[in-house]
Amino acid sequence: MSDILNSAIAKVQSSRHAFCRFITANDTGKNGSHQAGFYIPKCAALLLFDKPGTKGENKSKLVKVKWQDDFFTDSRFIYYGQGTRNEYRITRFGKNFPFFEEENVGDLLIIAQESDDYYHGFVLQTDQEIDDFFAYFNLSPEMTNQLIDISQPISSEEQVHIRIQEVVSSYTDFPGTIQMAQLARDLYNN
């Protein structure tokens, strides 16, 4: 598992609310749409606000999002409830935001809420990462575009697997026999 995938799993597990969906051509603006930012369906409103928006009113809040454990955006969560619109969006990513490109269509967007105004964002780009994320949370592609059920307990086997991946990813060279035996003992005892 990649470091990004491991981090995405950990952040989703420890989050208040988490959400995932596939990035569309509308999101990237590459199909000529005038849409701004990532669309969030009404069923995931609690990811953005403590209570759903009220038709006839707009509401918004500013948040900090840490992307890929690397860089931040000062983004805006907005509910458009006036006129004919009735939708939620995440906007304000800055001009050089790397995930609004045509090649990002089909990537998996993950948003995890850490606090009222601090979030983690991840974009998984490979089929293997997406499949592993789905497998970990027992999801399928049809189960995206909604909040992720993080209440499911994690099996001890999955916990060991995650811990092994964390340890393995910290090495650049294969450890020696004595070091490997010590790591195995530590993993078993913890």
Where do the language-model regions lie?
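Nuclease-adjacent, charged terminal/linker segments that flank catalytic cores
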Residues: 2-17, 72, 76-79, 85-89, ...
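Short, contiguous, well-structured surface segments enriched in hydrophobic/aromatic residues
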Residues: 64, 70-73
